[in-house]
Amino acid sequence: MRQAFKVVLSILMLWVTVAHAEVRIEITQGVDSARPIGVVPFKWTGAGNAPEEIGAIVGADLRNSGKFNPIDISRMPQQPTTTSEVTPAAWSALGIDAVVVGQIQPSADGGFLISYQLVDTASAPGTVLAQDQFKVTKQWLRYAAHTASDQVFEKLTGIKGAFRTRLAYIVKTNGGKYPYELRVSDYDGYNQFTVHRSPEPLMSPAWSPDGAKLAYVTFESGRSALVIQTLASGEVRQVASFPRHNGAPAFSPDGSKLAFALSKSGSLNLYVMDLGSAQIRQITDGRSNNTEPSWMPDNQTLVYTSDQGGRPQLYKTDINGGAPQRLTWEGTQNQDADVSADGNFVMMVSSESGKQHIAKQDLATGAVQILTDTFLDETPSIAPNGTMVIYSSTQGLGTVLQLVSTDGRFKARLPATDGQVKFPAWSPYL
């Protein structure tokens, strides 16, 4: 646990932080039908108020997953703080089969010790299903809470939790010398940082698979350029700045390659750079436009948008050669692909009858499900555990970030108060 904190700290501590209005998750649909669970306020043994409401953070994480509906404190039959204090029958009578209890106490060195227990209240009443403790400093209290949430979530669902992940996105503010900002926050909008500010547009951030770098598009040189920024040091490496368009970067799952789109020869085509040697290979050719690459888990196959059939649709191709294969057939057009980490499905922007929504296509069966009903949806990005998708949509005169579960049942938004937010990218596990 401590080593995990050190690794993430090495990535975060050198970023420039700026006081901004942060985004916060506002649930709009689906939590009422989720699995009920009890998350009791953690007991604070120090003086005054607790430095963080750890139980509230864990409860919010589980609620934000769309799979759990933590019972309100006012409805709790009791507020135990240890396993021995839990009365299983009181909880199971409310349809709750698991309860989280915990404690937070100050330590002599100025840090804090957090401990929790996940208690079964139904099938094996009183049994501890999961437990852990974390010794942390104040700035890592939320991270420790997210760690507990990850463990509880995985124990109850069998799916790895993604509460210790982050979001990258572009914010366009009104006025000022640097109206375009690349920002990063925790998945829930807390701990927001500014990575880069620019007087010119920024676009399309993409995470490296180790979470240490971001690739993005900048127009600061007077034309588009692709760069990779190392987050801990701030070092920027220019990848491509050819005439016309340079865009749509995507790291391969193993981190050895970067795919992107260039129009240096006329139409847009896909290219792949070996990041070790800096050698660039052209992958697609012809007069059609080919862009927005997303990698399959094999590190050899790209899913991308092409208008070779007339309107934009999704295709896939092997980067080592071979004919492209069309993937999408439903809808007027489909674009902006993001392939799930397991390669089982792809998220995309699907257009039909003037509507533009986020859709999911099963890559084995071809079945398509429209997930959203928001307006002018764009740029979906899948959480690393495959359960949630973040995307941008138009709301009023601006753009905001939205969340939807990959089954379409749970929906939420992350409104920002100081600008328009676009191009969200969900980090890998950190």
UniProtKB/Swiss-Prot annotation:
InterPro entries: 6-blade_b-propeller_TolB-like, PD40, Tol-Pal_TolB, TolB_N. One of its GO terms (cellular component) is periplasmic space. Residues 1-21 form the signal peptide. It is found in: Periplasm. GO terms for biological process: cell division; protein import. Keywords: Cell cycle, Cell division, Periplasm, Signal. Pfam families: PD40 (PF07676), TolB_N (PF04052). The Tol-Pal system is composed of five core proteins: the inner membrane proteins TolA, TolQ and TolR, the periplasmic protein TolB and the outer membrane protein Pal. They form a network linking the inner and outer membranes and the peptidoglycan layer. Belongs to the TolB family. Part of the Tol-Pal system, which plays a role in outer membrane invagination during cell division and is important for maintaining outer membrane integrity. TolB occupies a key intermediary position in the Tol-Pal system because it communicates directly with both membrane-embedded components, Pal in the outer membrane and TolA in the inner membrane. PANTHER family: PROTEIN TOLB (PTHR36842:SF1), PROTEIN TOLB HOMOLOG (PTHR36842). This is Tol-Pal system protein TolB. The gene is tolB.
